[in-house]
From Swiss-Prot:
It comes from the Bacteria. HAMAP family: TatA_E. Keywords: Cell inner membrane, Cell membrane, Membrane, Protein transport, Translocation, Transmembrane, Transmembrane helix, Transport. This is Sec-independent protein translocase protein TatA. It comes from Saccharophagus degradans (strain 2-40 / ATCC 43961 / DSM 17024). InterPro entries: TatA/B/E, TatA/E.
């Protein structure tokens, strides 16, 4: 028994019929197209994750710069009040 009650011989017969109907060149082309689509999808997902990470880093830098500016302003204010 193979997958779900289908024997290996039944799978081989189906494979032979598919090869006869479509031919090896067309199946090879379909396989290549499918592989290219999967590769493109993975690339798009990784690009999206990279863009999110860059946005988070930019936000962190912005917050750090704002905090530094606020600290500097507070320091200058204290110096002015001390005089």
């Amino acid at each position: 028994m193979g997958l779900g009650g289908i024997s290996i011989w039944q799978l081989l017969i189906v494979l032979v019929i598919v090869l006869l109907l479509f031919g090896t060149k067309r199946l090879k082309g379909l396989g290549g197209d499918l592989g290219g689509a999967i590769k493109g999808f993975k690339k798009a997902m990784s690009d999206d994750e990279a863009a999110k990470q860059e946005a988070e880093e930019a936000e962190q830098k912005k917050v750090a710069a704002e905090e530094a500016a606020a600290a500097k302003t507070a320091e200058q204010k204290e110096k002015t009040e001390a005089k």
